[in-house]
Amino acid sequence: MKIVVDENIPLADALFGDLGEIIRKPGREISSADVAEADALLVRSVTRVNADLLTGSKVKFVGTCTIGTDHLDKEFLAEAGIRFASAPGCNAQGVVQYDLAALAHLGYLARDIRVGIIGCGNVGGSLHRALTGMGVTCVCYDPFLTQDQNADLADWDALFTCDVICVHTPLTRSGPYPTHHMLSTPFFRAMRDGALLLNAGRGEVIDNRALKAYLQGDNSNHLSVVLDVWEGEPAIDAELAPLVKIATPHIAGYSFEGKTNGSLMIYEALAEFLGVNATERSARVAAVKAQAYGAAEPLDADDLVTAILATHPITRDDKALRDQLDQLPAGFDALRKGYPVRREFSHYQLTSAQIPANVTALGFSLDSAK
């Protein structure tokens, strides 16, 4: 069989090589001609998978190595009898690491703060657990959850009591709670004075034009902003980026583990679709995982902020995007393609006796001999 694979999907040979012939393509450039004779298509969020791409092709399986699925026309896939799979939660810990690195760099973790989280699914829920494990008070807004599922659920207006609001919703344009442009000028105005708005979910959830106008209107003292996701990627608004505190090229979930987990989850789905037995699938996943992840790395840090920023030097990513603002849209994609290896908290064993035990809530391990 032929498997067309986004060239940025890691471990493609190790995982999919025995299942068929691998044909690598740049994700944004995958065309109907590329997939005409393919049996399976493996993508990331940059590839629009719809009738225009797949009509007339032999594709019977589509896998996206991402949490989000708004780039897939799921209705078309179902009608066409094409199986599809995603990787929910694959990079949740990488996004949590990004959020905490932003808060650490901007000084919020050194203060007594109240954090609002919009959307408490895989990513938002992981962030909620990490923050509460650190003793941070959280306010969660998610109309699809109940109080039994999340004790910190609150109504929309409770968000405006928060010092920080983190956005982790999917992108939806219909249904009872559409998220497209959910946050615009009235929301910005209602936020607490000096608050931080952080979006590492989907760019279109925030009206970027309205945000730019608000920040250009001398409201930067009222509102600080961190953006990892943008409307119109990769052709983002180069005039908005200089107005925010941290600007990065959609790499929050680009941890090594996050990308690897996505590949592993889609391998499981494709192999099952092809009839590979569970024992063989599990053995392949275990072998690839052990080789890819390796042993824990010691990290000497005397406090939590230092530890977090040692694992994710977020100012590096911010500078990289600012340096490419005159090279958009190509520069945006180049940064994502060439993103350096970033390991999650779980890869590190903290060796300092000064570090608080609650860092294990983030996934760090502690040196038992300390």
Curated annotation (Swiss-Prot):
One Pfam entry name: DUF3410
Residues that bind substrate: S45, T66, Y254
Highest taxon, organism lineage: Bacteria
Active site: R202, E233, H250
Class of enzymatic activity (EC top level): oxidoreductase
Pathway annotation from the record: Cofactor biosynthesis; pyridoxine 5'-phosphate biosynthesis; pyridoxine 5'-phosphate from D-erythrose 4-phosphate: step 2/5
Catalysed conversion reaction: 4-phospho-D-erythronate + NAD(+) = (R)-3-hydroxy-2-oxo-4-phosphooxybutanoate + NADH + H(+)
InterPro entries membership: D-isomer_2_OHA_DH_cat_dom, D-isomer_DH_CS, D-isomer_DH_NAD-bd, Erythronate-4-P_DHase, Erythronate-4-P_DHase_dimer, NAD(P)-bd_dom_sf, PdxB_dimer_sf
A Gene Ontology cellular-component term: cytosol
Location within or outside the cell: Cytoplasm
Primary localization: cytoplasm
GO-annotated molecular function: 4-phosphoerythronate dehydrogenase activity; NAD binding; protein dimerization activity
Gene3D superfamilies recorded: 3.30.1370.170, NAD(P)-binding Rossmann-like Domain
SUPFAM superfamilies: Formate/glycerate dehydrogenase catalytic domain-like, NAD(P)-binding Rossmann-fold domains
EC numbers on record: 1.1.1.290
Transmembrane segments: none
Keywords: Cytoplasm, NAD, Oxidoreductase, Pyridoxine biosynthesis
Entry annotated with the keyword Protein biosynthesis: no
Residues engaged in binding NAD(+): D142, T169, D228, G253
Gene Ontology biological process terms in this record: 'de novo' pyridoxal 5'-phosphate biosynthetic process; pyridoxine biosynthetic process
Family of the protein in this entry: Belongs to the D-isomer specific 2-hydroxyacid dehydrogenase family. PdxB subfamily.
Subunit structure: Homodimer.
Designated name of the protein: Erythronate-4-phosphate dehydrogenase
Organism: Teredinibacter turnerae (strain ATCC 39867 / T7901)
Gene from which this protein is expressed: pdxB
